[in-house]
Amino acid sequence: MRPETQSAVTQLDSTLTTIEKVMNPEDLESRVRELEQQASDPTLWDDPDTAQKVTTELSSVQAKLKKLSTLRQRIDDLPVMYELADEEGEDALALADEELAELTADVEALEVKTMLSGEYDSREAVINIRSGAGGVDAADWAEMLMRMYIRWAEKNDHKVDIYDISYAEEAGIKSATFVVHGEYMYGQLSVEQGAHRLVRISPFDNQGRRQTSFAEIEVLPVVEQTDHIDIPDSEVRVDVYRSSGPGGQSVNTTDSAVRLTHIPTGIVVTCQNEKSQIQNKASAMRVLQAKLLERKRQEERAELDALGAGGNASWGNQMRSYVLHPYQMVKDLRTNYEVNDPQKVLDGDIDGLLEAGIRWRMAEQQGQN
């Protein structure tokens, strides 16, 4: 085995050992036994919500154990793979190098997940996108970002539910709200919060001038019962209207779309993509709860800041630039992480940006402690 390859394998083994210490397979196995015992209780499904939580956690913990076991086996197999490759020639060596590269990426991805230890990091994510300065280009840019996140979710086998889209008159969207389902979606996607800037030749300008557009991304954790975000009916005004599509045309002959206004705060949430008014109201209420939870968290952070013990709640502002002209580059202004192929990013290849953002956030938090 080449010295540089031996060094890479040794480093990989060391990284996984550190991950194993953090995740603690013995504790995970113990938790599996506890959950399996709960799942075998015939009365469990008398409470469907509790049953769902138990089965979901059981699947999650089992998946973590399987991931650790698989990665450990692959690392242990690498020296043998290279030993055989030395005997078989260049083609076998190329396959071994490919396995090393893929394994390194898999271990690094798991390492990043161990950094997601915040109170809400394991939750699903609500994403709100709003077009900003830039007119029709900004509306088009907001729609491009929505497509980017949905593509990323689909590539990673995460279901997306679109709750609401407000279409702009000429092209694009004014705003959109959707939920990305799956464990740790909030922890991963929360680093996307802030202003995203696009620089390109405007397809809507007859003179082909360069245009700068902005869109704002808000990422919220999905609220659970344990958060105790109770909203009295008296504090919510409910308005119903007909769903609309691009250009403002009605797409529903009944008043199924719902707008909720939280009277004490003035927060407004709409949902029109479900099939019925009841479903739209339930989805809108979930988003309203998420917004109120975030408001509560911001107030708590502001109190800590006043005591000199907290960070900046607006860390994500002006966080990334996507330049399509006069050169091609996506650059995160917090991490300095760069990608020279913007189209790949816009097609949902944002794992590198997310990982860099998570590492940056951890370093920021450690610097404040």
Curated annotation (Swiss-Prot):
Keywords: Cytoplasm, Methylation, Protein biosynthesis. GO terms for cellular component: cytoplasm. The modification N5-methylglutamine is found at residue 249. The keyword Chaperone does not apply. Pfam families: PCRF (PF03462), RF-1 (PF00472). Its main location: cytoplasm. InterPro entries: PCRF, Pep_chain_release_fac_I, Pep_chain_release_fac_I_sf, PrfB. GO terms for molecular function: translation release factor activity, codon specific. It is found in: Cytoplasm. PROSITE patterns: RF_PROK_I. The keyword Cytoplasm applies. Methylated by PrmC. Methylation increases the termination efficiency of RF2. Belongs to the prokaryotic/mitochondrial release factor family. Peptide chain release factor 2 directs the termination of translation in response to the peptide chain termination codons UGA and UAA. PANTHER family: CLASS I PEPTIDE CHAIN RELEASE FACTOR, PEPTIDE CHAIN RELEASE FACTOR 2. NCBIfam families: prfB. This is Peptide chain release factor 2. It comes from Corynebacterium diphtheriae (strain ATCC 700971 / NCTC 13129 / Biotype gravis).
